[in-house]
Design a protein with these regions (language model features):
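Accessory (non-J-domain) regions of J-domain/Hsp40 co-chaperones
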Residues: 1-5
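A short Gly-Trp-Pro
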Residues: 6-136
Length: 136
């Protein structure tokens, strides 16, 4: 993944100021949070999950489902919200999911999700913030 093609860019020092140490480890150093460790795993209100680094809309809560993995899981991203690349780390080939606006690592996508897409976007909760839908 070429870091300089994203609309939002920062130096490493700037990212370290913007993000918490845990967010930096996951979003910029491609780490993974412990399963079940993020409160957003249990978020059920209507709203939008956005990138913690730049505010890009990533997933709508209506696409979130309980996968039993310990990470927030979604079957469909917001159009244009995420991009993917091949991740060959850890001795396996996976599809990495990153923010389309700032390139931050979000998680991975797997072909074992529910209909209609059959996809499971397995996302590190700490890489997102939740914005509740406006009350009508």
């Amino acid at each position: 993944m070429k870091e300089d093609h994203f609309p939002v860019t920062h130096t490493d020092a700037e990212w370290r100021k913007i993000l918490t140490p845990e967010q930096y480890d996951i979003m910029r150093a491609h780490g993974t949070e412990r399963p079940g460790s993020c409160a957003l795993l249990y978020e059920k209100r209507p709203g939008t999950f956005v990138c913690a680094g730049c505010g890009q809309h990533l997933f709508e809560s209506k696409t979130k489902f309980e996968s039993g993995t310990g990470w927030p899981s979604f079957d469909t991203p917001v159009e244009g919200g995420v991009e993917t690349s091949i991740d060959r780390s850890m001795g396996m080939t996976r599809t990495e999911v990153h923010c389309a606006r700032c390139g931050s690592h979000l998680g991975h996508v797997f072909p074992d999700g529910p209909p209609p897409t059959g996809l499971r976007y397995c996302i590190n909760g700490v890489a997102t913030n939740f914005t509740p839908a406006a009350a009508n």
